[in-house]
Regions:
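Substrate-binding pocket helix/loop in short-chain dehydrogenase/reductase
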Residues: 91-92, 96-104
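Residue(s) in the substrate-gating loop at a strand-loop-helix junction
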Residues: 136
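Active-site loop immediately N-terminal to the catalytic Tyr-X3-Lys motif
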Residues: 143-147
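Conserved glycine-rich cofactor-binding loop
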Residues: 16-17
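SDR active-site lid
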Residues: 169-234
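Conserved NAD(P)H cofactor-binding loop of Rossmann-fold oxidoreductase domains
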Residues: 83-88
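Active-site helix of classical SDR
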Residues: 115, 152
Length: 273
């Protein structure tokens, strides 16, 4: 039996822009009641709909996440969409521990906190509740200069795998969504820190862009069809399969085919290695 999204009450993080905004646009068509959480006050203010409640919260700060939990205490949501993401690109030697922790707070710990709260405030126990977690291709294969992001997403992926089985006892479906490289500001405007930014070196993600609106519609269809995994077939998936079977080949492909090759050559020229 298909899942009926009509009139569902939903909380989504990172909903003011990008994939989150595209998902909200699709969910509004189904008369969903939405709580949109985002750290960008300007973009939040641009969202105006009677079915959307807006909450300003920076999930990089766990104190703010705690305040968020107090604001939604007692609410009975049908669906939680853990969509917010944050990335810092840098050589490990240049990234601060605080920035590394910020990555983990936004991409992992805040979502764990929301998931834990969601379990205790179920609107029902008859299979009508779902948690949708946005992981990443990089959760399956990390990329140089993106260690904080990739490792936090890998943690989130493993957490989701665990929850998918564990939450069955509460009749909660836990869905793993693996977005491709989307045509959003998250990817288009992302920059390196430190030396790599100063030298304006190409970002270490050479995958082609994919339509955000199209993927949002695919997610909605996947939810309605009770899918456990939602992803798009691409050459990246072929690479991940090869990497799974032969990790050493994955290493070679990353070194030779990604923008890391350009970065590595520049580091050598400037005597950084």
């Amino acid at each position: 039996m298909n899942y009926n999204l009509q009139n569902k009450k939903i909380l989504i993080t990172g909903g003011a822009d990008g994939l989150g905004k595209s998902l909200i646009d699709e969910l509004i068509k189904k008369n969903c009641i939405i709580t949109c959480v985002d750290k960008d006050e300007i973009k939040l203010n641009n969202i105006n709909h009677e079915n959307i409640k807006k909450i300003l919260c920076d999930l990089r700060n766990l104190n703010e996440t705690e305040l968020l939990l107090k604001k939604i205490e007692g609410e009975k949501y049908d669906i939680l969409i853990n969509n917010a993401g944050y990335e810092i690109g840098s050589l490990l030697g240049e990234v601060s521990i605080k920035d590394f922790i910020d990555n983990y707070n936004c991409n992992f710990f805040s979502h764990v906190m929301l998931t834990k709260a969601f379990i205790s405030t179920l609107s029902s126990r008859n299979g009508n509740t779902k948690i949708i977690n946005m992981v990443s291709d990089t959760a399956f294969r990390a990329i140089p200069t993106r260690s904080s992001y990739c490792s936090s997403k890998a943690s989130f992926r493993n957490f989701t795998e665990s929850m998918r089985v564990e939450l069955k006892i509460y009749n909660i479906d836990c869905i793993t969504v693996t977005p491709p490289k989307l045509d959003t500001d998250f990817f288009k405007k992302i920059q390196y820190f430190g030396y790599l930014n100063k030298e304006k070196l190409p970002y270490a993600d050479s995958r082609p862009f994919y339509s955000t609106n199209k993927f949002a519609r695919q997610i909605i269809t996947g939810i309605e069809n009770n899918k456990k995994y939602i992803w798009v077939f691409s050459i990246t998936k072929i690479f991940l399969f090869i990497n799974y079977l032969f990790p050493f080949i994955g290493d070679l492909m990353v070194e030779k085919l990604s923008t890391w090759k350009t970065i590595k050559e520049k580091l050598k020229i400037d005597n950084k290695v």
